[in-house]
From Swiss-Prot:
This protein's GO CC annotations: cytosol; small ribosomal subunit
Top-level division of the source organism's lineage: Bacteria
Function (record text): Located at the top of the head of the 30S subunit, it contacts several helices of the 16S rRNA. In the 70S ribosome it contacts the 23S rRNA (bridge B1a) and protein L5 of the 50S subunit (bridge B1b), connecting the 2 subunits; these bridges are implicated in subunit movement. Contacts the tRNAs in the A and P-sites.
Record GO biological process: translation
NCBIfam families membership: uS13_bact
PROSITE patterns attached to this UniProt entry: RIBOSOMAL_S13_1, RIBOSOMAL_S13_2
InterPro entries: Rbsml_uS13_C, Ribosomal_uS13, Ribosomal_uS13-like_H2TH, Ribosomal_uS13_bac-type, Ribosomal_uS13_CS
GO molecular function: rRNA binding; structural constituent of ribosome; tRNA binding
Region: Disordered, residue numbers: 97-127
Family listed: Belongs to the universal ribosomal protein uS13 family.
Protein name: Small ribosomal subunit protein uS13
Amino acid sequence: MARIAGVDLPRDKRVEIALTYLYGVGLSRSQEVLSATGVNPDTRVKDLSDEDVAALRTYIETNYQIEGDLRRWEAMNIKRLADIGTYRGRRHRLGLPVRGQRTRTNARTRRGRRVTVAGKKKAPSKK
């Protein structure tokens, strides 16, 4: 089983697609890695030789920041924004949209599910 950066690649998929299971590697970066290492993109992961896997692993780990390192780098950038008190950092901390989207309506993904507010109760009518 091919294991790169602590992630097991799916055995039955093409290498080009399987590399996208790594955080920080999309289709274009996957194609770039395969052309640089000389591995055929149509090869299935289970058919890769140990040398191919080693070549992919070393190329990716030396040239790109992926998985835990990339997640840590992103988290540190967000934390830095919050620590220096920027508007963006505050929006991140409050869980609101960061890039200027409206929040009066929409923004449900960032704000979470609706919290229903009870309507005003009607006073009992006197008869």
